[in-house]
Amino acid sequence: MKRLSFLLVIATAFVLSVLPGYAQDATSLTWATFNIRYDNPDDQANNWQFRKDTVTRFIKAQDIDIAGMQEVLHNQLEDLLQRLPGYKAIGVAREDGKTKGEYAPILYKENRFEVIDSNTFWLSQYPDSVGFIGWDGACTRIATWAKMKDKQTGKVFMAVNTHFDHVGTTARRESALLIIRKIKEIAGDYPAVLTGDFNVSFDSEAYRTITTNPFVLKDAEKIAGKRTGVAYTFHDFGRVPADKREKIDFIFVTPQIKVSDSYIPQEANTDGKYLSDHNPQIVHLIL
């Protein structure tokens, strides 16, 4: 009987080791979503040229492993990569599928992660049509994804990053459904993390579409063991009244992933400069 029990334990361990999303060692990651605000000369003192060093210092200080970023123009992407040796970026710009317009890039530590596959699709009725504006959207929107492997543990997972439309309610709902379909199709049983500026708060249809879908995606902040910092992300460089500020940037995870803590820093950094018109959100995940 003891021999049979021992063999069952060994067999179970073997099966788990070869199933998607399982490996011998857990993977612990520091993951962020961060709308860095596009390089707009009208921002004057808050223009990118005055914030880029503050942003990159923040990323280094937080030791972020992977970041989904939004509103990143090509020159901003170059600035980030120049100032962040050891990081690489995945993604293309939304207007031409190359360098024109905003990226929704995935920034990651090159020495830790192997990119197995990656691509960008357009949030529209025609996801492979470059530059297409979907449904009732005001402008072109994209999602960038990557299937990655942690070189330290062998864990395979999917990262998805997006920026939803700021006008179209149908576009936001349909974008949510499209991304869920893509995660199911590409990730399968592997863990997946969705980051983005969703341009909606908790009580929106798009948020409910993501969190109540039969394919489960959980709001990382809500399931975190510990939550610190402020409760909002968008503040418009401090111009939104304190009682009107909302959380419109989110990180969602599949059920295999544990969230040890979630942190949204105060909008003004230690040197007195704003990081952006949005606060980033940082989570520590265990895959």
Can you say where each PLM-predicted feature lies in the sequence?
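Active-site beta-strand/loop signature of hydrolases that rely on acidic residues for catalysis
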Residues: T30-I36, V55-L80, L107, A146, ...
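Solvent-exposed loop/turn segments at secondary-structure junctions
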Residues: I36-D39, V72-Q76, R94-K98, R112-F113, ...
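Second-shell loop/turn segments in exported
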Residues: N40-N46, I64-I66, F132-I133, N161-T169
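Structured beta-strand-rich core segments of catalytic domains in phosphoester-bond hydrolases
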Residues: I66-F157, D261-P265
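Metal-dependent phosphoester/phosphodiester hydrolase catalytic core
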Residues: A138-T140, K149-R173, I186
